[in-house]
Every structure is written in C-alpha cells, then in structure tokens.
C-alpha cells in the first residue's frame, strides 16, 4: 500500500472530485453561520444545510470539501480510544439533485482502488448497507462486483441517517481491513456485522442517500430532489496509509507528542509499543500525551476562528480543553504553563492547507498562555479541595467529583487515582449519572432548534431570475412582477394584503452581509405598495415583503422608489464599518478579526475578536485614523473577480465565517481597505462626512462589540446629547454641593465643575468631559463622606454628656430614646459611648417620622455574660425585629 502524508491524502481526494466536475468549497469557520441549532460546525455537511434544504442554490450541484469540525459530546473518551478526537477533518463529496446511489458508489470505489489514486487492495474493503436498501446492495454486488461475503445488510440503527425531522435516508459504509494483528481474539468480519468496537476494520467512508423527508412524526415522503452526503475522516485515512496503531502516531499528532516529551525534559516518553504490550502505568502516560496533542489542535483552530476561553457555550468548551490539558500536563510533571509552546507544532503540521493559522500564531499563543496561567492557580485549589475531601470523608461523592470535573478541570480518572492512594473510594456511577444529566440539560436547551430544515418545495422550485440594480440606482420604472406568494402559496393576484414579490429587476437591497434591507414604495395606476422588508432567496432573488393597497398581479409593470435618505445614511455607515475594521487592525494588529456587523441608517456596530479590551487611547487613535481617511477624500473602487484573485490581487479580507460565490465583489478604498462585500457604499470617503466611536462592550471572552456613528447630522446630535447628559450630571453634583458648602468647602470640586461647564462641544473634548465627570464623582464621593461625618458629629454633640447608670444587675448602662437619629447615627453614638466608658451596655432607640430604629451594643469585657443580640431579642416593653451578634445588634422596634 502507498505511504501517504495527511496533506497528500487530502490533495488526492480533492483533486479527484474536482476532476469529476465537483466544485471545491473552501473550509469555513468552526463557528456556525445563521444556525442556532449548532454550537460548532460538527460535520462536513453542516456547512451545506441551506443547499440541501433549498434555501440557497449551491455554486454547483456537485461539491467537495475538506472541512474542520468539532464534537465534544463525549470529550472524556479522547485519549482513551484510538480514533476519538475533539477536532477532526472530514473529507466530503456531495450531490444536490444530481447523481445518486450508483454514481456515488462508483466514484467512491474508483478513488479508493484505482492505482492513480489511493490504490487500496479491493480484497481489504468491506461494505455495509441498510437491510431494506436492495438497490444499494445490488450496486455493490452486481456493478462493483464485491463478493457477497464482504457485504453486510444491517439494521436501521447503524445504516439509516435520520435526525428526527427533515432530509434523511439509508447509508452505506466502507470499512478497511487492517489484518489479524489488530484482531487478537480472531473474531473476523463479525466485528462488522455485530457492530463491535474494534481496531481491525476501520470505517473510512460513509455515504448517505438523502431521499426522504421525515415530517417529525416518522412519516417519510420521497424528496422532490434527492441528494448525496458523504464523509470520510482524514485522521482515519492517515492512520491507514501510515500504518499506525492509532490516529495519534500519524503526522497530524505525533510531532506535537514529541514536543511534549521535550517539555517533560524527556522524563516521560510516549510508547507506540504499548498498544501491543499494554502496561497500566504507560497507558495512563500515553493517554496524557494523546489528550494534550488532541486538545491543543482543537484549541489552536478554535481561537484562530474567533472563539476565546470563557464561561459559556463555545468559550467554555475551549476553556475546558485547555484546563483538561493542564491537568494531564501536571501528570507528566509539567508544573508551568506549557500549552502555548505547542502552538508552533500544530501550525507547522497544518499550515499547508490552513495558511491563515500563521498570521494567528501570536494571538493564539498569548491567549492560551494567559488562560493557562490563570488556571494553574485554580488547579492548585482543586488539589487542595480534593485533599480536604479525602481527609474528612470515606468517599468522594458524585457531587464532589462533578465539582472537581467541571470547576477545576479534574478528569474523573485523576480523582480516582489520587483518592486510591489514601484508600478513599469515588462514587463513579453517581458521577456518570450527574454528568449525563448535565449533558442532557445542554441537549434539551437546544432540542427545539431544528438540526435540519424540512426541504421546502416552494424554495427548491424557485428558479425565477431577478437582477439587483441598486448598486447604481435607487429608483426604477417598469419593473416587472414575475412571482408572488403568501403563506408558502404561489398567487397570481393580491388585493389589500401583504405579499412576497419578486421583480425582474429591483433597486431594493436585501438584508445580508450585515446591511439592513432597503424600504420604500412601489406603485402603478392600480396600486401602491409599501416595501416593509427585503430578504434574499435561494438563487439570489430579492424577495420583497410588500403591504399592498389596491390590486397587484403577476406581470404587472410597477415603479420602484427606494427611501433615498435611509439608503444614503446606511451607505455611510456600511463604509464606516469597513473604515473602523481597517483602523482597528492598524492600531491593534492583524489578529483583530471581524466576526459580525450590522449597519442601517441609524448607526453601525461591529463585533470583533481580540485578546483584551482596547484602551481609550487605542480607540481614539483608531477613530482619528478613520477621520483622516474621510478627510483625504479617497475614491471607492469595485471589482468582480474569483475568490482566489480577490485575495491574491486585491488583498481582500475574506472571513472564514462567510460563504462566498464563485464570483465575488471586492470593495476597496485606496490601498488600506479591501474587503469582499455585496453591500452599498459611498463613492468617496468624504461622503461619510464624520465619524465617532460611541461605545465598546464585551460580548464574551475575547469578543467585543464597537458602536459608531457617521455623518455630520448623527455625530452632532450625539455630541449635543452626550454633553448635555454629562453637564446635567455635573450640575446635579454641584447643586448638592452648594447645599453643604457652608459646612465644608471643596475648591477642587468647584474647579472641576467650572471646567465641565466651559468645555466646548466637539469630538476631541468628549473624552475630556467624561474624564472630568468621573473625576468629579470620585471627589464628590469623598466629599459626601466627610460632610455626612460632620453632620452626624453635629447631631451627636447634644448627647456628649450622657453618663451611665447602674441597671438591676449593677452593670453600667446607658439607655436613650430620641426622635432625630437614624440607624447610622445610633451606631456611631454607641461606638462613641463604648469608647468613653468601660464595661458598658448601650440601648439606643429613635423614632423618626418614617421609621423606628434600635441599636444595642455591649463592651467586649461583658460579652462572656451579656450578649447584644440576647438583650435586643428580650428587651422589656418592646417587640424588636433585626439581627446581630454578641457585640452589636440592630433593627426596628414596636412598643408593646
């Protein structure tokens, strides 16, 4: 058999399908786009769902890709099994309404067995099919000529792909026989037929024949358009072609494992031979190496795609991977942060197909290092907690084990091993049940979100062509109505209702790429319609949601008028988004990556990833860079070209969270901003007019949202509003100060107020006045305390001559009832009296117009016999409500 590297395997796969007229889809981000049902891209087909359900038209009915994916539903198995990973790469070929079973099987067989490609021995391949899928069985037997003893007809459990609702169908799987050396019990093909986990017969390819729609109640209807969805794990192929015991000895992971060995000062070694001659201690060591090698790869890719360690969702998964790796690193004697030193190894092995990782190296290293160092402190607390549990209990409970697992990153194996050293047991079964409940809660939180949309016949058949003309115009006469529908029903005529309309040509922009949809009107002699919304259809038609007054019919000619003012201000903001993206990358570095945006006529916001919150000075610098480009009056340039040309020739920023067509549109401003974009933009930067950053907020670990405004009108309105808010706050502070300045004067507070009052309204002074106001609040906080202390002191002056008298127990006691003291005053008076007299009990009551207050205090010297809380609770003649301790009790009272 050929010995192939991972890069060679991937290339042979993609080149083969490209030669068979498949369109190559670039790998996309691990972060799903417009799919709340998924936390991660978890398969090769997950990125293609809109093509399969008909919401979008694919660039070709034949597709191929190599897609990175993450699955973490059983993360605890990583490092234990031979082929389980958090991140994996799935090779795929897909047919959307083109070829079906026969050609899919023939293509797979040719790639696997032809000497020009993988050249695998045909006799080493075994096949499974769904037991009711006679068609697939006969293709393998009669067309491919597979021996019948190499074909297994299995149940729905293993050979029918169904997620409960939407496209589904039978599948066929291809297995490679690695030989008897991997089958120590000599079970043979029954390992396949009985679906027994094994290392002899490796599943290399799964081909799903998507031919039914499940309505959600297990009623199956033939799809109007049948599809092929296949997946083949690259890591498994690598293990086969490199003849390794597990995936971890392949060129994907083994260089990282060798690097970890160096970081242990070679005190610990990974043993390949341990597979055949297992040793419990070495198996545990191997597991540690595997976990680290697997988790660091997933972490590098996730952070590069914009996921940062955090406390929820994707961020929590990455935090958990880092923490789990740290724990296993400690098992290998590594006590310092070390994972960040492995980033280079991961990038080196993956950069040929993922060159963008190179630019992310510094960001990824710094992010991992920061997270490691924070966790190492937590980890030591985890060890302390476990040691305390072991000292005080005979068993580590299920709840304690889960706490150690989730909050401190302790794998259950780690807890068991440490506990066993002290002959303490762990409630493993209880832990597993609690862990499953936690997982189920996560699943339930997402279960109502459909994993696959039911294939919509209306959209799959929606082939009418429509041209968007709005890049160069905002009005059009004699546009033709070519399609109308309502409630998923096609209509020919509509009167005084809302309807969805497609025109042959339209100037109305459909919401996409972060830009809001246009609004406006359409009209002719028979009707007037208000365009409420515009969304894009599966083949790029702009679908207008229109409230019709009068009657509108298919084939009518209408006049279109876009709301020009809304469009103009939206254009300013969209171009402003490109400007601030450029400026942030210029100020903070190219590790800044846009992860979403929205712009309409009212402003813009942009989400971006970065390892920390930018400083005010950095934001001001970015703002000034944008203003400089506006002042320089730079023309916009627009190009239509291939994705490859857009990057190579125009240095356009292409975002891995987006999917692009074969021909893309590049928007350039000078030599500083070049992005793929389908939106509307100003012709010259001067048309943006003005620019200001109005705020920034964290949207999660490593993700920030910046908000901005453009145009003279919007910026001036914002400045006037903000200055009024700040000056009103300053006015409120000084008004309160003026009420008390006869009691205590503060020149600093008065001076700051005058500076705020006299500050001129402009962008440069916005930060100045904000800082002055913050300074004023700090000074006022200190001033208020001093004034309140003075007021209290003055109120307490008339009680300075209080003296104790002996109570019935011959103990010094001061009892006072008054009407002018609040609870704070009473506590201060009690402290003053205890400081003045020794061995004293103080009982103070005050009845104001609004409330009653009581404070009881006891000198420390008496607290062995008299406790403030006891006196408080048993005060003769009063019902008290409150709390306290031996020293002091406080609350409210009612006379009996």
From Swiss-Prot:
Protein's GO biological process: alanyl-tRNA aminoacylation
Keyword ATP-binding applies: yes
InterPro entries for the chain: aa-tRNA-synth_II/BPL/LPL, Ala-tRNA-lgiase_IIc, Ala-tRNA-ligase_IIc_anticod-bd, Ala-tRNA-synth_IIc_core, Ala-tRNA-synth_IIc_N, Ala-tRNA_ligase, Ala_tRNA_ligase_euk/bac, DHHA1_dom
Top-rank lineage group of the source organism: Bacteria
Major localization listed first in the record, in broad terms: cytoplasm
GO terms assigned for molecular function: alanine-tRNA ligase activity; aminoacyl-tRNA deacylase activity; ATP binding; tRNA binding; zinc ion binding
SMART domains for the chain: tRNA_SAD
Class of enzymatic activity (EC top level): ligase
Similarity field: Belongs to the class-II aminoacyl-tRNA synthetase family.
PANTHER family in alphabetical order: ALANINE--TRNA LIGASE, CYTOPLASMIC, ALANYL-TRNA SYNTHETASE
HAMAP family: Ala_tRNA_synth_B (MF_00036_B)
Role of this protein: Catalyzes the attachment of alanine to tRNA(Ala) in a two-step reaction: alanine is first activated by ATP to form Ala-AMP and then transferred to the acceptor end of tRNA(Ala). Also edits incorrectly charged Ser-tRNA(Ala) and Gly-tRNA(Ala) via its editing domain.
Protein name, UniProt field: Alanine--tRNA ligase
Organism: Mycoplasma mycoides subsp. mycoides SC (strain CCUG 32753 / NCTC 10114 / PG1)
């Amino acid at each position: 058999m050929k010995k192939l590297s991972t890069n060679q395997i991937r290339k042979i796969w993609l080149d083969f399908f490209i030669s068979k007229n498949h369109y190559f889809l670039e790998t996309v981000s691990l972060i799903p786009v417009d799919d709340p049902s998924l936390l991660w891209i978890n398969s090769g087909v997950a990125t293609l769902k809109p093509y399969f359900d008909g919401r979008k038209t694919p660039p070709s009915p034949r597709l191929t890709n190599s897609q990175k994916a993450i699955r973490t539903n059983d993360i605890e198995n990583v490092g234990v099994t031979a082929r389980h990973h958090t991140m994996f790469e799935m090779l795929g070929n897909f047919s959307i309404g083109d070829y079906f079973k026969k050609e899919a099987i023939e293509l797979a067989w040719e790639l696997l067995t032809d000497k020009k490609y993988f050249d695998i021995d045909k006799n080493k391949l075994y096949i499974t099919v769904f037991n009711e899928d006679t068609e697939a069985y006969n293709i393998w037997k009669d067309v491919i000529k597979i021996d019948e003893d190499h074909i297994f007809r299995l149940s729905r459990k293993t050979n029918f792909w169904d997620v409960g609702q939407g496209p589904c169908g039978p599948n066929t799987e291809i297995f490679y026989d690695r030989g008897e050396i991997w089958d120590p019990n000599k079970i043979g093909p029954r390992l396949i037929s009985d679906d027994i986990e094994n290392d002899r017969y490796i599943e290399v390819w799964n081909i799903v024949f998507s031919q039914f729609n499940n309505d959600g109640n297990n009623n199956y209807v033939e799809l109007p358009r049948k599809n092929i969805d296949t997946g083949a794990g690259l890591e498994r192929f690598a293990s086969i072609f490199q003849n390794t015991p597990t995936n971890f000895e392949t060129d994907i992971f083994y260089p990282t494992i060798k690097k970890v060995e160096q970081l242990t000062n070679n005190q610990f070694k990974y043993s390949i031979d341990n597979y055949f001659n297992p040793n419990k201690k070495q198996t545990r060591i191997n597991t540690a190496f595997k976990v680290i090698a697997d988790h660091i790869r997933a972490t590098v890719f996730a952070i590069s795609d914009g996921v940062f360690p955090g406390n929820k969702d994707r961020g929590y998964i990455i935090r958990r991977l880092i923490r789990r790796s740290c724990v296993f690193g400690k098992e290998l004697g590594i006590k310092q942060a070390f994972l960040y030193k492995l980033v280079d190894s991961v990038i080196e092995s993956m950069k040929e197909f993922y060159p963008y990782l190179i630019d992310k190296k510094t960001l990824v290293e710094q992010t991992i290092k920061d997270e490691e160092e924070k966790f190492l402190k937590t980890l030591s607390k985890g060890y302390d907690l476990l040691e305390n549990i072991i000292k005080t209990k005979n068993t580590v409970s299920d709840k304690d084990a889960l706490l150690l697992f989730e909050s401190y990153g302790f794998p259950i194996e780690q807890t068991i091993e440490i506990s066993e050293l002290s002959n303490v047991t762990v409630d493993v079964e209880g832990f597993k049940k609690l862990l499953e409940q936690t997982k189920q809660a996560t699943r339930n939180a997402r279960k109502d979100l459909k994993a696959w949309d039911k294939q919509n016949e209306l959209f799959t058949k929606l082939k009418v062509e429509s041209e968007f003309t709005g890049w160069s115009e905002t009005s059009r006469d004699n546009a033709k109505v070519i399609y109308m529908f309502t409630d998923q029903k096609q209509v020919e005529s509509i009167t005084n209702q809302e309807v969805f309309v497609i025109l042959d040509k339209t100037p109305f922009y459909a919401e996409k790429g972060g830009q809001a949809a246009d609004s406006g009107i359409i009209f002719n002699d028979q009707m007037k319609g208000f365009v409420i919304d515009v969304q894009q259809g599966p083949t790029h038609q702009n679908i207008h949601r229109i409230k019709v007054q009068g009657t509108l019919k298919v084939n009518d000619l209408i006049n279109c008028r876009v709301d020009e003012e809304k469009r103009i201000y939206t254009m300013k903001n969209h171009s402003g988004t490109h400007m601030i993206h450029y400026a942030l990358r210029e100020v903070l570095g190219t590790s800044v990556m846009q992860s979403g945006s929205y712009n309409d006529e009212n402003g813009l916001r942009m989400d971006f990833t970065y390892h920390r919150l930018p400083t005010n000075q950095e934001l001001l610098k970015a703002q000034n860079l944008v203003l400089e480009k506006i002042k320089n009056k730079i023309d916009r340039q627009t190009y239509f070209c291939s994705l490859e040309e857009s990057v190579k020739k125009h240095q356009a920023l292409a975002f891995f969270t987006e999917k692009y067509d074969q021909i893309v549109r590049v928007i350039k401003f000078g030599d500083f901003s070049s992005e793929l974009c389908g939106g509307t933009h100003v012709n010259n930067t001067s048309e943006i007019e003005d620019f200001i950053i109005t705020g920034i907020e964290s949207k999660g670990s490593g993700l920030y949202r910046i908000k901005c405004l453009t145009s003279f009108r919007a910026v001036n309105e914002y400045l006037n509003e903000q200055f009024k808010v700040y000056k009103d706050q300053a006015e409120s502070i000084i008004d309160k100060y003026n009420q008390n300045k006869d009691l205590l004067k503060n020149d600093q507070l008065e001076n700051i107020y005058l500076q705020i009052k006299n500050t001129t309204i402009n962008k440069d002074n916005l930060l100045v006045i904000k800082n002055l106001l913050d300074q004023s609040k700090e000074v006022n906080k200190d001033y208020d305390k001093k004034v309140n202390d003075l007021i209290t002191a003055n109120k307490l002056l008339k009680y300075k001559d209080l003296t104790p008298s002996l109570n019935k127990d011959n103990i010094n006691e001061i009892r006072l009832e008054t009407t002018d003291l609040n609870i704070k005053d009473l506590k201060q008076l009690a402290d003053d009296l205890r400081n003045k007299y020794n061995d004293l009990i103080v009982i103070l009551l005050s009845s104001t117009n609004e409330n009653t207050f009581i404070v009881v205090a006891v000198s420390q010297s008496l607290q062995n016999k008299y406790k403030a809380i006891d006196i408080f609770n048993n005060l003769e003649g009063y019902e008290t409500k409150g709390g306290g301790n031996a020293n002091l009790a406080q609350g409210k009272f009612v006379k009996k």
